[in-house]
Amino acid sequence: MTELTRRRDKESAREKWNIFYGDVCIGSIGQRAGVPNHADQWEWKCGFHPGCDRLTGGPAETFEQARTAFEAAWQLLLPTLTEADFQAWRDQRD
């Protein structure tokens, strides 16, 4: 099984990591902007477009909580995807 990797989004003003499955960006984990200090400061998003029209995500108190939630969502999403879904994303990238 292909391992998930993360790469820092250098264009983001806040800490943000793009998550990759092979060469396909399947989501992100990053600090939220414009939220009060007492609110969850992190967010995660799992899914990609085109190819996968099912995007899930949510807030998290810490990076580790966001990562755990992302990984759980990915484990549910991955079995529903085909190689054609990943190829659709590659085609729009290239």
Language-model-detected regions and their locations in the chain:
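Short N-terminal "domain-start" leader segments
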Residues: M1-Q41, R67, E83, D94
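Intrinsic disorder/low-complexity segments enriched in polar/charged and small flexible residues
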Residues: I19, W44-C46, L76, D91
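Short aromatic-glycine-(Arg/Gly/Cys) micro-motifs in beta-strand/loop hairpins
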Residues: Q31-T56, P79
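Long, contiguous binding/interaction regions
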Residues: G34, E61, Q87-W89
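A short, exposed loop/beta-hairpin motif centered on an aromatic-Gly-Thr core
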Residues: F48-Q65, A73
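Short arginine-rich
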Residues: E71-D85
